[in-house]
Design a protein with these regions (language model features):
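Non-catalytic pre-domain segments flanking phosphatase-related domains
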Residues: 1-14, 37
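Short helix N-cap motif at coil->helix boundaries in the Bergerat
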Residues: 22
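Active-site phosphate-binding/coordination module
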Residues: 26-123
Length: 123
């Protein structure tokens, strides 16, 4: 039987809102210190529902380099070059069907499109 190789690839994916930052959009000294300590040993990336501009802003504040994940994981942006590395979106046809179902069911929904967020709230 073949031996399994030990995998030495580790990384940390962290949420932005409610984890790295609170409502005031401030990163505490404790969080900055902890992220810096971790990023000296393993790759650290932000994963957020926000757009590329925000993920780049906060990755810069945390001195994170490499891929960062935004728009609920549909887009990958390089923190160094600021270039979009990959985008995986739902087709327009399927998106339209989903939105029609939300409207028909009178459910609340949040849609991110082209870096803008649209919310249909009952409030």
């Amino acid at each position: 039987m073949q031996k399994l190789k030990k995998i030495n690839n580790y990384g940390l994916l962290v949420d932005l809102d409610g984890t790295i930052i609170q409502n005031d959009e401030f990163i505490s000294t404790r969080v900055k210190r902890s992220v810096k300590k971790l990023s000296n040993h393993i790759p650290v990336s932000i994963v957020t529902g926000r757009g590329p501009q925000d993920v780049l802003k906060f990755s810069k504040l945390l001195n994170l380099y490499g891929p960062q994940y935004c728009e609920n994981g549909t887009s990958v942006v390089d923190a160094t070059s600021k270039k979009i590395l990959d985008v995986s979106l739902i087709s327009d046809d399927i998106s339209s069907k989903i939105i029609k179902e939300f409207i028909y069911s009178e459910m609340e929904y949040l849609v991110v499109s082209d870096g803008k967020t649209y919310i249909n709230s009952k409030e």
